[in-house]
Amino acid sequence: MVHLNKTIQEGDNPDLTAERLTATFDTHAMAAQIYGGEMRARRRREITAKLAEIPELHDSMPLPYMTREEKIMESARKLTVLTQRMSEIIDPTDAGELYHLNNEVLGIEGNPMALHGVMFIPALNAQASDEQQAKWLIRALRREIIGTYAQTEMGHGTNLQNLETTATYDIGTQEFVLHTPKITALKWWPGNLGKSSNYAVVVAHMYIKGKNFGPHTFMVPLRDEKTHKPLPGITIGDIGPKMAYNIVDNGFLGFNNYRIPRTNLLMRHTKVEADGTYIKPPHAKINYSAMVHVRSYMLTGQAIMLSYALNIATRYSAVRRQGQIDKNEPEVKVLEYQTQQHRLFPFIARAYAFQFAGAETVKLYERVLKEMKSGNVSLMADLHALTSGLKSVVTHQTGEGIEQARMACGGHGYSMASYISEIYGVAIGGCTYEGENMVMLLQLARYLVKSAALVKSGKASQLGPLVAYLGARSEPTSLIDRVPNGGITEYIKTFQHIAKRQTLKAANKFFGLMENGEKREIAWNKSSVELNRASRLHTRLFIVEAFARRVNEIGDITIKEALSDLLHLHVNYELLDVATYALEDGFMSSTQLDYVRDQLYFYLQKIRPNAVSLLDSWEFSDRELRSVLGRRDGHVYENLFKWAKESPLNKTDVLPSVDTYLKPMMEKARQSKL
């Protein structure tokens, strides 16, 4: 029999199969929506199937039972096998296929080349000249060298203008002299910098004839290509264990008057001639392209990690029976409780929303990158602002959702057998890397304040498409409860009203402080909380709109209905979360707020039959999830016991610590009692 849910197999836990039999849509068709087309979804399944047939690519034991050194060795082993066999499994030039391959085999804890493909190659692709790409990019793509991106320092991260590493041009030798003037100038945190990489794209302040030309990027050799030992003038190493992501050797890097050729300055957009003449880039933010690249792709990565945790928690909630709703009936599935649904389902909606918003942002990034190659950087400021806000909101809400998923699993969620704690640790790193979240919101706020200034000066026609709503006329009150089924358009108008009101309020506070004599920087700081609120609301509006646009594009009725239910759940949940802003000026009434609550509870119930299938549609294999609680077959308890028995502590009945310390202590206590 052909089922709509394609994950059903004989012998599965009947409670989980029962959930899957209530699906109202084909999970393969939903996967096509998630991953950008039927071909991409099918390729993911084909890659997963091929990988399952290669035993050398399987973990030798569960990762939680390995030491950090063992994990790094295991990851390097699998990475080497992948490099040898990659071309028979995927198209190495396809970023989506490569990402899935890495997730399946190397997992979320990282690998010795994690930054190589995510930041090093994109930096060379975006900022190196054609000649430089011929020299370095080809070698990087062939994995002849391993590289990373070194920007963050011990003393400064997001504040690029105050980075302390210097690159001073020596006209006599036509070399840049890289130097770390003090301990806070050490590069600190770059992934794979500590032990794996032999090259790095380094960000340093460039000095020519005593003048600081600001931060620029340089291609810097770090280690001897034959011995892998650090080159003279280089101080380099691992910064130690972290909250998660410990297969990655995040490192430190210092320079002692270390010389590199002038031509190691990445020169696609900026140049330094032999005589020290500086040719500036066409746009001030053009060198941000590597970070914007990561922020654009981070969104779908965060959506996947949120979906990992939700898969685990929702499947487990479908097989875990606890308590009774009706005392005359047997114990019920935890998923039957409205509180559990309210804890998980809105985050299922967010995962889809983040995926669709992320896909839209990646398309915009690819458009900007293409235009940059021909010298057009007009959209970079818009993209930088958008990705700053999205990066902040999405990483924060993803962390919230993963933690809710862990707690939804009860005590077993705390075990590494659930693997949710590792997912959480990896995901929340995104709240601080590639820009600390509060600072990211303020970067978007600068864009919003400039837009508000246009509105204030009567130049709303000059607003870009992302902020056009700031100059549009608003309805006097929300019409949410007056349109059948709570029309999505009315919800969007409500979000627009809220975002517009808060943006103009925050901007007016900033403008007012300056008009009253405050210095710009002081006025900005005193307005920053309100400005960040505006940035969050603007970003959440964009996510809602992106979700709605995606649903409107879908032709398959069953898929459209299922995603429309998720969209309705999303807008009601999100609106309840920010309702204070709509109540403050009377745009919404308390009666309308009650209506929104009722709609939320209605859609929790409506989504209930599809909950497991909406997550199965992401089509994660058991190897990718690495979770006993989230197993596809639902056989949790017997495998939880099996997993526990694999603990290295269970290889012996009596631990050396007992023989050495605890047993003598107890014996001494017994003797003293006598």
Curated annotation (Swiss-Prot):
UniProt-recorded name of the protein: Acyl-coenzyme A oxidase acox-1.1
Intracellular or extracellular location(s): Peroxisome
One GO term (biological process): ascaroside biosynthetic process
Cofactor(s) listed: FAD
Pathway in which this enzyme or protein is active: Lipid metabolism; peroxisomal fatty acid beta-oxidation
UniProt note on regulation of activity: Activated by ATP. ATP binding leads to a conformational change that promotes FAD cofactor binding and enzyme activity. ATP binding likely occurs during acox-1.1 folding and/or dimer formation.
Catalytic reactions on record: nonanoyl-CoA + O2 = (2E)-nonenoyl-CoA + H2O2; dodecanoyl-CoA + O2 = (2E)-dodecenoyl-CoA + H2O2; a 2,3-saturated acyl-CoA + O2 = a (2E)-enoyl-CoA + H2O2; heptanoyl-CoA + O2 = (2E)-heptenoyl-CoA + H2O2
Result for mutant: Y245F: Shows catalytic activity toward asc-omega-C5-CoA without affecting activity toward asc-C9-CoA, asc-omega-C7-CoA or fatty acyl-CoA
Active site: E434 (proton acceptor)
Main location (coarse class): other
Family note: Belongs to the acyl-CoA oxidase family.
Annotated tissue distribution: Expressed in hypodermis and intestine.
Chain's role: Involved in the first step of peroxisomal beta-oxidation by catalyzing the desaturation of fatty acid-derived side chains. Specifically, catalyzes the desaturation of fatty acids heptanoyl-CoA (C7), nonanoyl-CoA (C9), dodecanoyl-CoA (C12) and to a lesser extent pentanoyl-CoA (C5) and hexadecanoyl-CoA (C16), and hydroxylated fatty acid hydroxynonanoyl-CoA. Also, catalyzes the desaturation fatty acid-derived side chains of ascaroside pheromones, which regulates development and behavior.
GO molecular function: acyl-CoA oxidase activity; ATP binding; FAD binding; fatty acid binding; flavin adenine dinucleotide binding
Origin species: Caenorhabditis elegans
SUPFAM superfamilies the record matches: Acyl-CoA dehydrogenase C-terminal domain-like, Acyl-CoA dehydrogenase NM domain-like
Residues annotated for substrate binding in this entry: K285, I286, N287, Y288, R295, Y433, E434
Subunit composition and interactions: Homodimer. Forms a heterodimer with acox-1.2. Forms a heterodimer with acox-1.3; the interaction may be important for the stability of acox-1.3.
Keywords: ATP-binding, FAD, Fatty acid metabolism, Flavoprotein, Lipid metabolism, Nucleotide-binding, Oxidoreductase, Peroxisome
Gene induction: Induced by high temperatures (25 degrees Celsius).
